[in-house]
Amino acid sequence: MRVLIKNGTVVNADGQAKQDLLIESGIVRQLGNNISPQLPYEEIDATGCYVFPGGVDVHTHFNIDVGIARSCDDFFTGTRAAACGGTTTIIDHMGFGPNGCRLRHQLEVYRGYAAHKAVIDYSFHGVIQHINHAILDEIPMMVEEGLSSFKLYLTYQYKLNDDEVLQALRRLHESGALTTVHPENDAAIASKRAEFIAAGLTAPRYHALSRPLECEAEAIARMINLAQIAGNAPLYIVHLSNGLGLDYLRLARANHQPVWVETCPQYLLLDERSYDTEDGMKFILSPPLRNIREQDKLWCGISDGAIDVVATDHCTFSMAQRLQISKGDFSRCPNGLPGVENRMQLLFSSGVMTGRITPERFVELTSAMPARLFGLWPQKGLLAPGSDGDVVIIDPRQSQQIQHRHLHDNADYSPWEGFTCQGAIVRTLSRGETIFCDGTFTGKAGRGRFLRRKPFVPPVL
């Protein structure tokens, strides 16, 4: 199968050019002008459009069981939504397994979840929910099998203490893996939450007040220092929501420490006022939404390069689930927002089309740096001969209003309802196959492939 994309502006992280792009047997074969492929081939006219590498979302939670509920997107509906939003690769954060389980247990479970459902290519982050000799011995074997990143939690049921974190950081570093972390100070949060509950203050706004930005920033600073103690172990901070944490990361970078950070569209475009609306419960997530001042600080990090990745933390619970389980109490509400379908369009509209970032920086944030950090480069995140033919075509001339009824996830609402975006995703190709075109999903369940990722190699800071 050959596909020729003509007359578009092809953009990579290091530059752009108006040229044609030829994909053959799922692989990019040629870029240039006046390409004349062997017949037969499909021709796609991208006049006036940007031709970007397909998005790489390195933070999703599909089919996750959080104890009180299971998310309503599985690996079909979740990856279908991703495809319709221009994302062609996801790396899913696996949920916790049974108490005391081995690392391999969750990998086998999640490969079963995805095998016959995923529309796009996928991988997983390991999750370390306890530390013992067996777990530490298992890490190098998992890296050899293609899992080169693992997540630690400083909050929730399976939070690790500082000694366990140090052991994990050392072994992951030795094994060629990148440590990712959910950083929040669990003890401080528990104290604040207990105060509010005792006072009968359980409305959605108290979710944010119980998890102040200092709880997140303190945990970020602690992880930075622990990573240094562990032999300058590489560290990746997930879902950054505030400027103080970013200041700590800037300081670590200035000291040449190998740290990277992601943020998410919700922290760039939504704010804490959402908790005071009639539907405030739909915005319960952790870390919570912050104020507009924190948004501005994050946008500075997006613009000046301090933030490396924009992912989604897509973790969808329906409003029916939220209301039935929480009964109006924020502390009982399952956490998470949908967003995997909207990430690329939201960042293009609010970043590229406003002049905050260049098209090249858009690629760096949404595909190139995620692929480099997580062992997928140059197969993913790049349009060059030999790379996978993963493409998203965006038309900057089109304006669209986000409406849930047009989305493809399994939620019953969108936090972005009514947002007007300048720029529309008109086509998504995965390994040369069109899986979304002009508003219509054309992919199929089970076509996605499991990606064995390479050991971690730090990009140049």
Swiss-Prot record:
CDD domains membership: D-HYD
Annotated GO CC locations: cytosol
Residues recorded with modification N6-carboxylysine: K151
GO MF, one example: metal ion binding
Record InterPro entries: Amidohydro-rel, D_phenylhydantoinase, Hydantoinase/dihydroPyrase, Metal-dep_hydrolase_composite, Metal_Hydrolase, Metallo-dep_Hydrolases_sf
EC number: 3.5.2.-
The record's free-text note on cofactor binding: Binds 2 divalent metal cations per subunit.
Reaction catalysed by this enzyme: D-5-phenylhydantoin + H2O = N-carbamoyl-D-phenylglycine + H(+)
Enzyme class, first EC level, given as a word: hydrolase
Positions annotated to bind a divalent metal cation 1: H59, H61, K151, D313
Co-factor requirement: a divalent metal cation
One Pfam family this sequence matches: Amidohydro_1
Keyword terms: Hydrolase, Metal-binding
Subunit structure as annotated in this protein's UniProt entry: Homotetramer.
Family: Belongs to the metallo-dependent hydrolases superfamily. Hydantoinase/dihydropyrimidinase family.
Role this protein plays: Catalyzes the stereospecific hydrolysis of the cyclic amide bond of D-hydantoin derivatives with an aromatic side chains at the 5'-position. Has no activity on dihydropyrimidines. The physiological function is unknown.
HAMAP family hit by this protein: D_hydantoinase (MF_01644)
Name the UniProt record assigns to this protein: D-phenylhydantoinase
Organism, as annotated: Escherichia coli (strain 55989 / EAEC)
Lineage: Bacteria, Pseudomonadati, Pseudomonadota, Gammaproteobacteria, Enterobacterales
